[in-house]
Structures are given as structure tokens and as C-alpha cells.
Design a protein with these regions (language model features):
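Extended terminal accessory/targeting regions
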Residues: 1-94
Length: 94
């Protein structure tokens, strides 16, 4: 699992190497969920942080990975729940 640094502390990422605040690698994504997070991070870098279109793409990417019977599927559900309720900035306002 990836880690992020905060004031010298190493804090684990939410999931994999790319899922969670401050978790933008390094390292390859560990699976398809982590790939969705990497794509989301790259989208924010390109379109700006909190771009609605990036959050919508993340939700689409995670949609078929949600499965409450598996740990991995529950992670996808948790990330989806967060971003479906988060405020974002419409792309036309950037």
C-alpha cells in the first residue's frame, strides 16, 4: 500500500498507491480500482482540482467494481459514495 508524507510521518493511502488524499504514486496501480484513482489524479492535474468531469469519470470507472461481498468491492463503494456526495467545480467555471 502506498504512503503519503505529512510533517515527516508516513500515512497510508486509502487504497493501493493512488487512492486517497496526497496519494499520487509512486508505483504502478495495484489493480483496476487503483487504476481508476490514478486516472482521476491525472484528470485533476489536467483539468484542475475538484473538476466535476473528473469526479464523474471516476464514478463511471468504479461503477462495475462495486461489490459489497468483497473487500475490494466495498472499497470501490466507499470511494464512489464519497465522490457522489462531494462538491465539485463545473468545468465551465475553471
Amino acid at each position: 500500500m502506498g504512503r503519503r508524507r505529512r510533517r515527516g510521518l508516513r500515512i497510508p493511502c486509502l487504497y493501493g498507491n493512488w487512492c486517497g488524499p496526497g496519494c499520487s504514486g509512486p508505483g504502478a496501480p495495484i489493480d483496476d480500482i487503483d487504476r481508476c484513482c490514478k486516472k482521476h489524479d491525472r484528470c485533476y492535474q489536467k483539468r484542475g482540482y475538484f473538476a466535476c468531469s473528473c469526479d464523474q469519470e471516476l464514478l463511471r470507472c468504479l461503477r462495475d467494481k462495486i461489490d459489497m461481498k468483497t473487500e475490494k468491492g466495498r472499497v470501490a463503494a466507499m470511494i464512489s459514495a464519497f465522490f457522489s456526495r462531494s462538491r465539485c467545480i463545473p468545468d465551465d467555471r475553471k
